[in-house]
C-alpha cells in the first residue's frame, strides 16, 4: 500500500508540474500573425510576420487616397452608392479632415444633384508632395441626362497622418491607418 501511495503522490507532483509548465507556456503568447501580400493574379509577393510598427508604402497610400477622391468627388446615379462612398471617405479622415468634408458637402450638396447628373472621376496621378502630403491629379467627366456635359481637370493636395489602428472596427475600415487631415483642391484652367 505504501508503494501505491508514493506512486499517487508522484503522479500528483508530475501532474502539478505539467500544469505549471502549460500555464507558463500559454502566457508566452507565441502565436505570430503573418501578412501575405499578393499580386493581381493571386501570387504571393511578400510574406513577413505582422509588425505593430508597420509603415505603409507610397503606392499603398496612393491607392487609398485615389479611392478617397473617387468617393468624394464622384457622383453615381444611385443614392445608396453615393452614401456608402461618403461614409467610406469619412473613415479615412481625422476630425479636421471631416470638418473640411462637411464644409464641402454643405456648399456642394451631392445628394441635391442626384438623379440627372453623374460625375465620373479618373485619377491620373498620385505623387508625394512632401513628407506629410500627396498631390493628386484627376479628370472629372460630368454627364447630364446621360450626355457628356463637361470635362474638367482637377488637382488636390491632401495632407495625411498615419496612425496604427487600435481597435477591430478601425482595422476593418482603414487597415493601414492612413487619415486625411487637410484637403485643398482646385480646378485646373487652360
Language model regions located:
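Structured, amphipathic secondary-structure segments that form assembly/contact surfaces
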Residues: 1-12, 22-33, 40-59, 80-190
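Hydrophobic and amphipathic membrane-targeting/association helices
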Residues: 16-18
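Solvent-exposed, amphipathic alpha-helical segments
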Residues: 64-75
Amino acid at each position: 500500500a505504501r508503494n501505491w501511495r508514493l506512486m499517487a503522490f508522484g503522479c500528483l507532483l508530475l501532474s502539478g508540474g505539467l500544469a505549471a509548465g502549460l500555464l507558463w507556456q500559454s502566457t508566452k503568447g507565441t502565436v505570430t500573425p503573418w501578412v501575405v501580400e499578393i499580386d493581381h493574379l493571386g501570387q504571393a509577393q511578400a510574406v513577413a510576420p505582422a509588425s505593430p510598427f508597420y509603415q505603409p508604402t507610397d503606392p499603398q497610400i496612393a491607392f487609398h487616397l485615389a479611392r478617397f477622391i473617387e468617393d468624394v468627388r464622384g457622383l453615381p446615379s444611385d443614392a445608396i452608392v453615393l452614401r456608402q462612398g461618403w461614409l467610406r471617405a469619412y473613415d479615412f479622415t481625422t476630425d479636421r479632415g471631416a470638418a473640411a468634408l462637411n464644409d464641402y458637402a454643405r456648399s456642394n450638396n451631392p445628394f441635391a444633384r442626384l438623379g440627372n447628373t453623374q460625375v465620373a472621376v479618373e485619377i491620373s496621378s498620385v505623387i508625394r508632395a512632401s513628407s506629410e502630403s500627396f498631390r493628386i491629379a484627376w479628370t472629372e467627366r460630368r454627364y447630364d441626362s446621360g450626355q457628356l456635359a463637361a470635362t474638367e481637370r482637377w488637382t488636390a493636395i491632401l495632407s495625411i497622418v498615419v496612425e496604427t489602428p487600435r481597435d477591430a472596427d478601425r482595422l476593418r475600415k482603414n487597415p493601414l491607418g492612413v487619415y486625411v487631415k487637410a484637403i485643398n483642391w482646385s480646378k485646373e484652367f487652360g
